[in-house]
């Protein structure tokens, strides 16, 4: 039934059509009409007031990653809108469905350098899948509906809708509609490519499977697990592919690439077939393109044809939705057996275990303890740096949408906002953000968001008083010249958190951490744990920049090299 509504009412009606129940944002002058309507309909759509618009964009991203639904954030014109840019770029790089709604000055004020006027459509063009500016009330509803459809279809991504203030107040006829059904973009998967892939898989003696974030975005975890059993192959993943395949499964060998396990890096280098599923072959994964998987033929399965042969030359590509492609392959492939190869991989895992210093508090030790105390069931978000790699290496993820991190853009300050979004979307899960002390400083104000909105996230600060990952590179490749990476100062994170209304404790031993973490979970309140570790702790293994992944080295290898050089 048609009814006369103003633009702000239409925005809310369109959000409800799409099943939106939570919005993250920060108000301002240009968007006041929409916020007035949010107030009137607060029983239908919950608005989380963040401490900064960037926090809102990360929260929408975290909500989307944790739930599989579209995350929604809002901001006013000018600096409010530009503060969303880093979060939109983060979502864009990782193909996360987010819809950002911003308001702009009235149509008559556009192009006149008006107060808080900005061409946010132009600004966000490189970091959104699509964007709009709505200057006509008659186009508002269709634009918002289309934005949601674009964000979710094909290769997912963020979409921005900028609405002039006069449109939010204007009135027109509105008729509610059912949301459009999202169909895979590539409905016809090429038979020739499928046949080639099947022939290559059935001819392989030493196949390896590489899983990326596209498997999660396609909700293809079940099909992936069936496929791996069907072809009897070892499995590695990218940072974005965590949880698609269970971390406790014997076939799983860990992450591939710069900080991947030696087993994955050496195993892929010795394979005769690499099946890359839903991954874009980031430089952090392949290392040296010329030597990457040089013995192997490569099959790439991806929804986006632009990713084929972009970084790594492949032999066969199947373009299509990962879930749809694997469903076909699982139906048509015969059962494979690779006992000798699988045993070789198990021997490799025994030869190259992941180790760390257990006599003191350390990043890996913290992650393993969190895994133990949460029984592997928590949602883990991270910032970016050493702690991010430790969280990827030492928490054994059993399901998709359990590990939320900024993979492509590498955004420091992402994790706390993402944790807030994830907890809003999955209130029954324990949500833990793993942060470094450098990252915590970026968006620490979102602790106030958690306390104000009573969102019980746990913030674990892995505090080594340095910018750990940058310092690691300075130590290994820049002659130990530690330029601007030392953070020894008088900032007290515990007092900061307490000042914002959260509970907090500082811990210096694993025993102290265990007791404090249990208390944090039991409190069901925002809680910060300041965990003091050694400044010299490093992420191992490591591949030197530009090096071959087969040359991954660890601390022992480095010591042997130093001893040989000193002879």
Question: Residue locations for each model-derived region?
Answer:
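Thiamine diphosphate
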Residues: 116, 452-545
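Active-site diphosphate/adenylate-binding microenvironment
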Residues: 8-12, 16-21, 29, 34-39, ...
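Hydrophobic, well-ordered secondary-structure elements that form the walls
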Residues: 298, 370, 382, 421, ...
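N-terminal alpha/beta PP-like core and its mobile active-site loop of ThDP/TPP-dependent enzymes
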Residues: 1-333, 369, 373-376, 456-459, ...
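A short acidic, glycine-rich active-site loop
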Residues: 48, 183-187, 406-409, 479-488, ...
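Phosphate/pyrophosphate-binding active-site segments
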Residues: 138, 199, 295-386, 510-511, ...
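Catalytic phosphate/nucleotide-handling subdomain of diverse soluble enzymes
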Residues: 414, 418-456, 462
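Active-site nucleophile and cofactor-binding loops and adjacent substrate-binding regions
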Residues: 26-28, 47-58, 73-80, 135-136, ...
């Amino acid at each position: 039934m048609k009814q006369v509504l103003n633009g702000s009412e239409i925005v809310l009606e369109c959000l409800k059509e799409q099943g939106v129940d939570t919005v993250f944002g920060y108000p301002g002058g240009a968007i006041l009409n929409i916020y007035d309507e949010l107030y009137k309909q607060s029983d239908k759509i919950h608005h989380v007031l963040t401490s900064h618009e960037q926090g809102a964009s990360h929260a929408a991203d975290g909500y989307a990653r944790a739930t599989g639904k579209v995350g929604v954030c809002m901001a006013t014109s000018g600096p409010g809108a530009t503060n969303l840019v880093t979060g939109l770029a983060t979502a864009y790089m990782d193909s996360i469905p987010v819809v950002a709604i911003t308001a702009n000055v009235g149509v008559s004020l556009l192009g006149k350098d008006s107060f808080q006027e900005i061409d946010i459509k132009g600004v966000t063009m490189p970091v959104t899948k699509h964007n709009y500016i709505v200057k006509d009330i008659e186009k508002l509803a269709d634009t918002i509906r289309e934005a949601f459809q674009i964000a979710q279809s094909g290769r997912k991504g963020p979409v921005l809708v900028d609405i002039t203030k006069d449109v939010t107040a204007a009135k027109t006829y509105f008729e509610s509609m059912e949301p459009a059904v999202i169909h895979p973009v590539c409905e016809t998967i090429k038979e020739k490519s499928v046949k080639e892939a099947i022939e290559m898989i059935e001819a392989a003696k030493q196949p390896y499977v590489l899983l990326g974030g596209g498997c999660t975005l396609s909700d293809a975890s079940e099909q992936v697990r069936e496929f791996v059993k069907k072809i009897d192959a070892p499995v590695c993943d990218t940072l974005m592919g965590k949880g698609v395949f269970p971390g406790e499964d014997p076939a799983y060998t860990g992450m591939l690439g710069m900080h991947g396990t030696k087993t994955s890096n050496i195993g892929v280098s010795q394979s005769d077939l690499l099946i890359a599923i839903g991954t874009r072959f980031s430089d952090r994964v392949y290392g040296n393109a010329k030597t990457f998987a040089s013995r192997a033929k490569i099959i790439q399965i991806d929804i986006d044809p632009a990713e084929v042969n972009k970084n790594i030359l492949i032999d066969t590509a199947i373009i299509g939705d990962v879930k749809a492609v694997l469903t076909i392959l699982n139906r048509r492939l015969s059962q494979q057996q690779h006992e000798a190869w699988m045993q070789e991989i198990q021997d490799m895992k025994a030869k190259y275990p992941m180790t760390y210093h257990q006599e003191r508090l350390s990043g890996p030790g913290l992650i393993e303890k969190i895994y133990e105390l949460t029984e592997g069931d928590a949602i883990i978000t991270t910032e970016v740096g050493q702690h991010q790699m430790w969280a990827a290496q030492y928490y054994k993820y059993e399901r998709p949408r359990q590990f939320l991190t900024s993979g492509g853009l590498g955004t420091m300050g992402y994790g706390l906002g993402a944790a807030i979004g994830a907890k809003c979307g999955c209130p029954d899960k324990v949500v833990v953000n793993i942060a470094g002390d450098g990252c915590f400083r970026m968006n620490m104000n979102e602790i106030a968001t958690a306390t104000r909105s009573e969102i019980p996230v746990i913030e674990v600060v892995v505090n080594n008083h340095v910018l750990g990952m940058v310092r690691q590179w300075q130590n290994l490749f820049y002659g130990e010249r530690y330029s601007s990476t030392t953070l020894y100062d008088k900032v007290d994170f515990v007092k900061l958190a307490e000042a914002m209304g959260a509970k907090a404790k500082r811990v210096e031993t694993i025993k102290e951490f265990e007791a404090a973490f249990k208390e944090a979970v039991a409190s069901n309140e925002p809680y910060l744990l300041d965990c003091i570790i050694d400044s010299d702790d490093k992420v191992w293994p490591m591949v030197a920049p530009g090096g071959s992944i087969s040359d991954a080295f660890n601390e022992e290898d480095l010591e042997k090299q130093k001893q040989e050089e000193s002879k």
